[in-house]
């Protein structure tokens, strides 16, 4: 879904592969959250926008659906997604279609092509600030995407902020401090500061312009992601039901 120099290309996939142990606590936290969101869904199809190779996609969650359709602009994403998840999905009877395509270039047509599917944005909305020419344009595009999804079941996990940490938190093992989690929008500065302080965040942290993706009626879950030992991302997750 993103240009290869952002979250695609050979180096990105190599980095994701070698970071599996570091990322595992976040993947496990997201798996629990995702299963909770779709346990009562009536949709049998899932569309993943910005799927990459599914490095953080829990296979057991994917197997809940009869169809999985992935979209990503990175030409390596589709074959690597099939390599990582294809066999298990086939064994489960889940049909997998992986397309190399910019799904956001014509989102209305994609929604019409998959009228009953759940739509999931896999860490893509927070990257739009890097692919657009300015902050205002990125914010406008995010708002237009959200408007386009009215009446649909959809979810997103995306970067809310990212930045350096002082490395004091222990990495590895089963330590719950590895992956701090907290519900709520955290839209008040004091709440955000408390959250960032809990992971020893060091200024400056980058705002990914996703603070208004979800309205106040949508339950939001926050998860930290140790992208690198000394550089973490604050992930915001939410699921919208029609």
Report the location of each language-model feature.
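Conserved class I S-adenosyl-L-methionine
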Residues: 42-54
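Charged, low-complexity C-terminal accessory regions
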Residues: 162-242
